[in-house]
Structure formats: C-alpha cells, structure tokens
Amino acid sequence: MQRSFDDLGTPLSDVTFVVLDLETTGGSPSACAITEIGALKFKGGQCLGTFQTLVNPGVRLPREIVYLTGITEAMVGPAPLIEAVLPTFVEFIGDAVIVGHNVRFDLGFLRENLKRLGYRPLTNRFVDTCSLARRLVRDEVPNCKLSTLARHFRTSADPCHRAFDDAAATGEVFHSLLERATGLGVLALDDLIALPTTAAHPQVAKLRWVASLPRKPGVYLFRDGAGRVLYVGKASDLRRRVRSYFSSDDRRKIGPLLREAQSLDHIVCVNDLEAVSYTHLTLPTKRIV
C-alpha cells in the first residue's frame, strides 16, 4: 500500500524555506540594533522571492562594525526604522522554515525586536547550516565558517558581511548540504531538523533506513547479514523511534546493535496494543537492547 505524505512527513520538496541574514551593531539582541536584513525564499530549489533593506538602528554605528560590514552612517541615516520594516519582513517569512548560518544569532535579534514592539513571537521551525555542515562535511573543511563553506561549494554569491550577499551564499550552501543529506535518506523536514544530532552517530550510513518508515504504530525488526532477527521493538511512531537510535547517547547499549544490524523490517499496526502482540510473534535470537 502506498504511504501518504502524512505518514512520511513533509517532503523537503514541498517545504518553503526562508534563508536570512542580519547585520547588527553588535552581538547582544537586548543592547544592540539591526542595521540590515537580507533574505531569499525557496521552495523545491526555486527562488520565490527576496527581501533586502538597510535599517536605521537609531544609534551611532560602532567603528568596528563600519569596518567589518562597510555599512556607514550615511547609508543607514535615510533607511527606515525597524518598526517600519519588521511587519513586512514577518509577512515575507510567513510560516516558512527559517534557515541561517548560526541562525540562533539572527533569531535572537528578531525575537527581541518583535517582543519590544509588541508582536507575537516567531514559532517557525528553523535549520542552522553551520550545525548541518559540522555533521555532513566536517572532514572536508578546516572549519564551518560561511566563507569557508562558500569556497568549498563554490557558491556564486560571495559572503562579505552584507546581509543579502551572506543570505544568498547561505542559500547556496544550504542546497549543497541538502544534496548530501538526501544521500543519507533524509527526505522529510523532521529528518532534516534532527540530522545535526543523528549524523554524529558512527553508523550514520544506516540512517537511510528511516526514510522508508511511516509515522504510524508498529513493530520494527533489526536483522543481521543472514536475515536473523537481532531485536524486535514496538513504537507508536516507527519513524521517530528508529531515528532515535541514531541520536541516542547510550552508545554502550545501542552501538553493538547498529553495528551488527544489516537490514530493518517493519510491520504497521492499527494501534500500540496490536504492536505489542506482534512483538511476540518473532523472537530475536540475540536481545542486544
């Protein structure tokens, strides 16, 4: 029977992403201000729109920020204040998944300004390209700075501490990392968001097993190279449960099972009670977990 998208999770090709970058007067969201916003909206690899504006921070720019970004007092002086920019930018983001390099920095400034101006907080899901890169290409690059990754993936956009250019470079890096992730069986949004922890597992190549599992109750069976059952488990959400094996910190117990396992089978059940009954039908020859 063909599974629905709800069973598998939202396919990445159906997800709208907004890749963003902010320039600011410093590192503290509560004490510093936004000077520039740049963002691009993508779905299915296609750019749907862009957002770009300077922002008058309402304070003098620190000398080191002018030197770093090239943004000057003359540039931000005639620019709109953040209270004039933020409503339009929030509308641009909509319910998209937010992507950024060290994205928590950008989200911190957005949340602080939304709170100060009396807007509802952002509840969007987000993906950090820095965390993804640490898991997917850490052996290929000396570090995971945006400039390093841009050179590694030969992006056409050059990150230069200007918001739109950095957002464009981040978007190209993100799509290159997506290609790596799909090679591990990451085809749905939940799996992508979980990847920074699951990809650290030494048996990460077997993570592609997760892609075939529905989000339904059932039984899963780890098998060795000869097809013998190593372990039978039940789950209310097969996909989430098996994926958790790759992010578990208890490597002493989980590690031996994943090292020996060479395949994974599953049986979809109507509910948890039916799943319990199935676990008694096929007993493991070796109960590792």
Segment roles from a protein language model:
Residues 1-123, 139-161:
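Conserved non-catalytic scaffold segment of RNase H-like nuclease domains
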Residues 162-173:
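Acidic, divalent-metal-coordinating active-site segment for phosphoryl/phosphodiester hydrolysis
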Residues 220-252:
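GIY-YIG-like beta-to-alpha core
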Residues 279-285:
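Conserved small/polar residues in nucleotide/adenosyl-binding loops
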